[in-house]
């Protein structure tokens, strides 16, 4: 058995100090856990009790389960153990009582006070060898634990947790027992019981107990320091008694509980401070709730007025270039809006007109909101409101000019681009066909590159511009109210520049969209024309082939009519026929390759010429083959010509497929641009809604500020009237 702490401080008559006794429980109670017990080394009963219990627990595994630890005890958390030690050392009886039994209504106050005094060394009664329980009553011995089981029926059951300490002071049931033959009654015997502090834990708790239970010298010095600090606290708090009358009202109640033992009570305790802090926090919460109620009432009143006059919130869908017509709507706003609102003056009328004018310009997102927010940060400064009004008027004048200029520039730019487009088309039609084919190739490559860059830049540019707008709008609301007017003007100019860039990008996207639509229409027309040409060529070829077959059947008649030509053709060498065949191939293939490489806008004329030339060559070959029907190479020649025609048709079909692919690409581009336009419209609507919400909040806050100022001015006016009267 190990113990920490000193012997009796003042000999036999001094108050004992707390000590910790270590035991190890067997498997039947806990699986070999170290347990620590708190007691007084001067109290022989407590030391003998812990030692005998430890011996019995080591000796037998059946008896310790029904020992003193099975008595009802109080639960104490590990976090409150340090507070209990400090309260016991400093003599803070209410603090110990608060830790041991914070809500125990079943224990009598007097019994609880007597049990707590055992833990407080300053107030424990001086013991003599005659008053010890083992000298007066031999039955009262640690081995006879049945008495404690009988007398401790009123206290609570001890539930030992794995990591939670507990204190078990014994509570007497019979308080009216009398002293006979020098024996003490149960209450005075149990005054000697200092309790058992059960610490289930580890070596950290052992170190904690050593640090909180020093030896004699260290404990004496600590007690002296505590007395000095308690005296200083008394002097400090005597000066605060006039300011805090609630603390003095709590002291007599504490004195009533402890009037029989004449225990001095300290004026300030931790739980008193906590209660005061809770009271202050409750006051703050009530104040905040009142403010919220006032703001809600103001919002409701503003909503009623808003519904009554129906201020236009935001248009659903409007054209992009109609800002010049929006300025006229400001005159139609009813001026009775400010007269019907209670507490509003002429300044409110100007402020409302300013906010409504901002609603008529949705492109201007946030220039004057920052200036309007300043009165919210400085509710008691009157100059800020005038600055806000003047700056908002300035912004309005500038934004009107900017919107007019933007509209003029945008319309002029669109007309100029349309004119240029038509002029370019007319000049291209007037050029030579050869020059047109070369330039169309270059234009096609340039258009492909431009479309790729457009796909990349349009997606990234619009999103990046919107993302770049967001932090600036947020920074406007988060700027400090003490910023100079120069910084405000600078931010306003930056925001206008960003908005102008955004407008320009939207205009360019619209122009590109229109150009793509026109190109799409042209491509559709060209594809239809080419399909018609293919159909006509196929019908002509089928007709010529049928003529050739009929001619092949009537070869005998031709031989009778033209015998000389037959002989001449028969006498021709095979080389000559081969050369003619190669010439025909050279005539057909280069034109086919040329047709494959040409642009769709010039294919129509070239295809007509090509089909006509191929048809003539084909007819010449058929005539030659008619003359050379006896030649063995006549049949392969016909097959070769037929294959050439099929190859030509395949090339044209491939060209049609390429055109369809281009059409699909253009349609995809159009859909992408439409999505981007819809997204930009959505962002505009969202920004307008945010702007309107912020203006509503500003209006509510201004009303609240004016009402508060009116409430503050009312008592001043009353005082002035009283003084004047």
UniProtKB/Swiss-Prot annotation:
Residues 215-244, 490-546, 648-713 form a coiled coil. Residues 543-552 have a biased composition (Low complexity). Residues 1-25, 87-188, 213-260, 453-485, 528-586 are annotated as: Disordered. Residues 1-11, 528-537, 563-583 have a biased composition (Basic and acidic residues). Residues 224-234 have a biased composition (Acidic residues). The keyword Oxidoreductase does not apply. Residues 129-150, 165-178, 453-467 have a biased composition (Polar residues). Keywords: Coiled coil. Belongs to the CCDC144 family. This is Putative coiled-coil domain-containing protein 144B. The gene is CCDC144BP.
